[in-house]
C-alpha cells in the first residue's frame, strides 16, 4: 500500500515537550486491519526507531473504542504503559473528542480501561502478577547492577516481564551504573525484558515517592526514559512488600539520568470485592503532528 495517513509523536508522562518518553502513533482508523501486514507494521516501527510505535485500528467489538497494536523496532508487544497513554492522547486528537472521560482500549493483552480527567490520562493495568525468584538469580542481578538490594527482588508479569528491585534510597538508584553486557546476558538467559530499579525519596514532602529507572539492554533499550509498564511492576511489587491495607498512591519520578523529567502517578486501589487493582496516570503532549507515507 502507498497512502498518506495521519501521524503524531506524543511525549508521555510530561506536560513539557522533550522531557518525557515519546511514542509514534499512526492513525489507521479508516483502514481495515487486514489491509496492512505484520511485516509492514514492523518495518514502520523499525524505521521510527522509537522504543514503541503504535497503530490505531477500528475495534473488533463495540465494547471497545479503538484497537491498539504496539511495536518495538524488533517485535510486537501485548501491552505497554506509556504507549497506552500517548495513543489515547492521539486518539482523542485524531477524533476531535474533547469531552470523553472514559475509554476502553483493545490490545493483545485484552481490554484496558482508561479515564481522562483534566488532561490526566489513567489506565487500569490489565495484569500485574508477582513471582518470587531464586537467591542465585538475585545474586546475579545484584552483580549486574553493582548494588545490594534492600528487599528480595521479584519477577513481575505486566505484559513485559520485569525484575523489580529496591535499593536504599533515590540517590542510590539515580547513581546506579549497571554492567549492561552482564545485564543483557542475565535477562536473555532468564527470558526477562529487563530490571526496574527503585529507591524511596526519604526526604520528599509527598509520602510514598520513588525514583525509578528501567534497564532493558537485551532489547536494545539500555535505559527507558519513562516506563509505564515498569511503574505498574513497581506498584505491584511495593504492595507485595508492604501489604498496604487501603488505597495507596505512589509518586514515581524517572528519566533524570537521561535529562528527562517524567512523572507517573500510581494508585494501588482496594476494590469493593477486596481485590487490588493497579492504575497508572500521567500527562501527555503532542510534539509532532502531520502525515506519514505508508
Swiss-Prot record:
Keywords: Isomerase. Disulfide bonds: none annotated. Its EC number is 5.1.-.-. It comes from the Eukaryota. Disruption phenotype: Leads to defects in unfolded protein response. SUPFAM superfamilies: Diaminopimelate epimerase-like. PANTHER family: ANTISENSE-ENHANCING SEQUENCE 1, PHENAZINE BIOSYNTHESIS PROTEIN. This is Uncharacterized isomerase YHI9. It comes from Saccharomyces cerevisiae (strain ATCC 204508 / S288c).
Amino acid at each position: 500500500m502507498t497512502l498518506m495517513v495521519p501521524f503524531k509523536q506524543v511525549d508521555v508522562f510530561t506536560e513539557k515537550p522533550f522531557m518525557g518518553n515519546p511514542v509514534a502513533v499512526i492513525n489507521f482508523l479508516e483502514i481495515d486491519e487486514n489491509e496492512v501486514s505484520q511485516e509492514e507494521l514492523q518495518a514502520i516501527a523499525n524505521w521510527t526507531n522509537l522504543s514503541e510505535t503504535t497503530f490505531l485500528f477500528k475495534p473488533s467489538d463495540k465494547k471497545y473504542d479503538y484497537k491498539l497494536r504496539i511495536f518495538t523496532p524488533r517485535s510486537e508487544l501485548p501491552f505497554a504503559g506509556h504507549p497506552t497513554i500517548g495513543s489515547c492522547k492521539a486518539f482523542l486528537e485524531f477524533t476531535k473528542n474533547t469531552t470523553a472521560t472514559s475509554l476502553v482500549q483493545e490490545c493483545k493483552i485484552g481490554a484496558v480501561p482508561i479515564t481522562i480527567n483534566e488532561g490526566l490520562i489513567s489506565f487500569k493495568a490489565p495484569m500485574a502478577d508477582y513471582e518470587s525468584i531464586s537467591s542465585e538469580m538475585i545474586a546475579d542481578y545484584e552483580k549486574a547492577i553493582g548494588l545490594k538490594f534492600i528487599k528480595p527482588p521479584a519477577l513481575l508479569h505486566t505484559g513485559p516481564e520485569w525484575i523489580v528491585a529496591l535499593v536504599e534510597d533515590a540517590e542510590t538508584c539515580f547513581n546506579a551504573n549497571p554492567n549492561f553486557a552482564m545485564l543483557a546476558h542475565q535477562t536473555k538467559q532468564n527470558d526477562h525484558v529487563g530490571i526496574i530499579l527503585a529507591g524511596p525519596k526519604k526526604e520528599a514532602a509527598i509520602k510514598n515517592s520513588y525514583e525509578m529507572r528501567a534497564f532493558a539492554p537485551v532489547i536494545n533499550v539500555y535505559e527507558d526514559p519513562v516506563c509505564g509498564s515498569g511503574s505498574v511492576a513497581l506498584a505491584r511489587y511495593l504492595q507485595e512488600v508492604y501489604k498496604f491495607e487501603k488505597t495507596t498512591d505512589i509518586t514515581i519520578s524517572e528519566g533524570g539520568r537521561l535529562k528527562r523529567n517524567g512523572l507517573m502517578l500510581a494508585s494501588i486501589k482496594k476494590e469493593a470485592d477486596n481485590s487490588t487493582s493497579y492504575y497508572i496516570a500521567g500527562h501527555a503532549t503532542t510534539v509532532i503532528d502531520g502525515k506519514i507515507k505508508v
